[in-house]
Amino acid sequence: MRILHVMGTLDPAAGGPSQSVRVLMSYASIGYVGEVVTFDDPEAPWLKTLAFPVHPLGPVGSTYGFNPRLVPWIRANRHRFDGIVVNGLWQYCGLAARRALSGTDTPYLVFTHGMLDPYFKHAFPLKHAKKWPYWLLAEYWNLRGAYRVLFTSEAEKQLAEESFWLHRWTPYVVPYGAKGPTGDPETMKQIFFDQCPQVNGRRYLLFLGRIHRKKGCDLLVDAFAKLAADDPELHLVMAGPDQQQWSAELQQTALKAGIAARIHWPGMITGDAKWGAFYGAEAFILPSHQENFGIAVAEAMACGTPVLLSDKVNIAEEIANDGAGFMESDTLDGTLRLLQRWIATSPREREQMAEQAAASFKQRYDMQQTAKTIIGLFEAANHTS
């Protein structure tokens, strides 16, 4: 099955969609053979080591990514693919795909990647108001024209209908997750410790993601400051790109609380260092205000690391029910309870949670199932066309 992914960027710092597409492209052995067309600059460093074909049509001059080359490119190349996957909303990708494929027999899917969560309507009402004209003129029709609109959980699918009053499309919930690590955990841990030597030989909790207000980073720093004295040997690693230049303010908060030496900021970590960070952590923590899935959650579980999540992570409830982690509200009190519950667990309870995390990952979040599902959708679409 030959599949084309259309997306704004493959930059790992852009978050989950970039990582998920990279993982999907690794499943050629089961028939998922793909290429990617992006708005990236051809000289972008993150494109240099990819093992699959990429067609960078950038650079572009805005986050929307209007590019007059994209529609003709898709029209000229669509015959090489059994189907096309549009990743994300609110960029030119979706409109270009719909225009290029109009009147053809090439099906396309739209992967929303959480971008229809009503959180954004409430957190950024002005931005939401500005999106209405584009929704009415373009984005809604991009979804209406798709063979299927993909969601990663039933909760995400239901929440999507609360963002805009026009929501007639054909939804489909796909299994989603991550690809687990391959290699020696001890070697990977040492690679991480080389990048963050302050926690070598120490106990730590791990936050791994963008340093962004949506992720609840301030809640985590404030909660850790309040409970630091309850477990004086416990450290916190805040790993991820700081796109909002916010970490300095958070570090100042830690300094005023007298715990700056126990919170560490290694920046974005990737590859073996990332897996080493997961393997070395007591638990992964994500007090996010909105998370349609959270690839880092699945990656932590793949390493047998328990996860401490807010109830706004759409998969948090099923993980808590599996005994692989804890779930609390996305508030300061909720984040405090996550830390309190973790500190109160016994070594045996932590071992059991780690075992459940690994088992739950294998049962629920193996990304190979995502690849098989997308293949099946395109097989069905082409059979009926």
Region roles according to the model:
Residues A248-I269:
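Nucleotide-activated donor-binding/catalytic signature segment of Leloir-type glycosyltransferases, i.e.
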Residues L89, H289:
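Aromatic "clamp/platform" in nucleotide-sugar-dependent glycosyltransferases that forms part
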Residues P306-S310:
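Short hydrophobic beta-strand element within catalytic cores of glycosyltransferases
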Residues V37-E43, A178, L208, H235-E249, ...:
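Glycosyltransferase donor-sugar binding loop
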Residues L4, L150, A178, D194-K215, ...:
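Conserved donor-binding/catalytic core segment of Leloir-type glycosyltransferases
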Residues M1-E43, K48, P53, S385:
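N-terminal subdomain of nucleotide-sugar transferases
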Residues N321, G325-D333, R341-P347:
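Conserved acidic donor-binding segment of nucleotide-sugar-dependent glycosyltransferases
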Residues L116, K131-V149:
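Membrane-proximal helix-turn-helix segments that form the acceptor-binding/catalytic region
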